[in-house]
Amino acid sequence: MNSLTDKVLIMKFYEASNAGVKVDLIVRGTCCLRPGIKSVSENITVRSIVGRFLEHTRIYYFHHNGEKKFFLSSADLMTRNMEKRVEIMFPIFSGYLKQRITQWMQIMMSDNVKAREQSSDGTYHYVKRAEDEPIVDSQQTLFQLAYSVGEDEE
């Protein structure tokens, strides 16, 4: 997403973290949640990917009772979007689409070129790539995937 500023939803993320739920967030811009605080958000990571493209997907993925649930949305998690705008969120049922979205999320979570992780004090640092790790620029990789899609896949 682009922004996470809604206090109610941030508190829900903290509750989930305290219940032992692992939460990985990709928030391109403003993020008021603070990850990695003991007994508050120690199970939460926040990363930001800012590159050539104004890219911020709004994919919401949940693993619930052994079932993978995927949703796409028009909304960032901002109070104004939750309270004052008409937004939409819809589920993804297609197994094929779930596989593609999973691939995209894995690519974004593997980015070690443009990705930065947020520290508990709100500062960001670039993700460090291990020497034996391949270089992953998620925006470039996703661009190449989109460019290579055949007409029969559209």
Q: Which positions does each model-derived feature cover?
A:
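PLD/PLD-like phosphodiesterase catalytic module centered on the HKD motif
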Residues: 1-154
